[in-house]
Amino acid sequence: MSWWWAGAIGAARKKFEEDDAPRDCQSVALIIGVTGIVGNSLAEILPISDTPGGPWKVYGVARRPRPAWNADHPVEYIQCDISDASDTHTKLSPLTDVTHIFWVTWANRPTESECCELNGTMLRNVLNALIPKAANLHHICLQTGHKHYIGPFEAFGKIKPHEPPFTEDMPRLNAPNFYYTLEDMLVEASEKKAGLNWSVHRPAVIFGFSPFSMMNIIGTLCVYAAICKHENTPLKFPGTKAAWNCYSVASDADLIAEHQIWAAVDPYAKNEAFNCSNGDLFKWKHLWKVLAEQFGVEYAEFDESEKPTSLVERMKDKGPVWEEIVRENGLHTTKLEGVATWWFADVILGGECLLDSMNKSKEHGYLGFRNTKNSLISVIDKMKAHKIVP
């Protein structure tokens, strides 16, 4: 079977060993956002010996110093603030051998117009630094997401989103959206440089490992479960009845990475936008039991008689509790606000269920998939192994 199929069912990967003989690299990747939830998966998967398009040499860019949990990946780490044109040019223009860019980062601002401005500046700085220098640059993967179909957070309830299931041919909504800004910049850049192709990847809510991610739903729920366990309280669902009961889709971070690599090396996938989800359906009420089991905490059914309380409200004074959990369990030193994004979990667990279609990816030859329950367990195991949660 193909590498995509083998990866999708969790077949053992050929890990790159530091004492392997030097390899002549066919492709050179630049991961923008290497410590993010998908960037970390790309940093794990690209260096594997049989990854399509390889052998790969990998550069990874992030704003902060390299974290310990990312340090084992055979990646040349570059600390760079890509919102700063001078820093970006100084750090990235020497990378003349780059053949593929994987854009898996974003920056948040109070308004969507500001998001458009800042994220557009970041992409422009990277393209301006690389395109004149990297003669063999021929593909850019841009990761966006379901907000392409429902609008930015500030527009929720103000504009009419598309009706699920989402398909890639749905028109843009009439609202500012930095996803649209980045797509337009990508297409414009490809039109100016001969041989430069692109792909856009639109995942659902992402299940993956990255303590630094602003939108890490599973990491946040792991912290919530650990606090419930520590305080000997039931694991209550903080969202709505609709989210508890309805069918949902998720996107495993490794699957998204594989999807992007496929699009980067397969000629039939170039210059296209694709949804990217696991290919199955789940209900939060079923995953909630799994989460409770993994942390040995009492599971609580959704109770309609109780007034809903957001995680932002429940967790607002739990900083000292988290410090105690970290100290007692010998965990990696973190602040609660650094490992848990309560507002994002409230958005996901308080909203309507958003389904998409993977038909276009299948029609173009991508058959990867994930079991969402197993994806959840895998992320929890990784959080524990890296001593982020007990």
UniProtKB/Swiss-Prot annotation:
GO biological process, one term: monoterpene biosynthetic process
CDD domains, A to Z: 5beta-POR_like_SDR_a
Sequence positions that bind NADP(+): T35, G36, I37, R63, R64, D81, I82, T105, W106, Q143, Y179, S213, M214, M215
Keywords: NADP, Oxidoreductase
Catalytic activity: (S)-8-oxocitronellyl enol + NADP(+) = (6E)-8-oxogeranial + NADPH + H(+); (S)-8-oxocitronellyl enol + NAD(+) = (6E)-8-oxogeranial + NADH + H(+)
Active site residues of this protein: K147, Y179
Enzyme class: oxidoreductase
Enzyme Commission identifier(s): 1.3.1.122
GO MF annotations in UniProt: oxidoreductase activity, acting on the CH-CH group of donors
Protein task: Iridoid synthase that catalyzes the first step in generation of the iridoid ring scaffold using the linear monoterpene (6E)-8-oxogeranial as substrate. Iridoids comprise a large family of distinctive bicyclic monoterpenes that possess a wide range of pharmacological activities, including anticancer, anti-inflammatory, antifungal and antibacterial activities.
Identification of the protein by name: (S)-8-oxocitronellyl enol synthase CYC2
UniProt lineage: Eukaryota, Viridiplantae, Streptophyta, Embryophyta, Tracheophyta
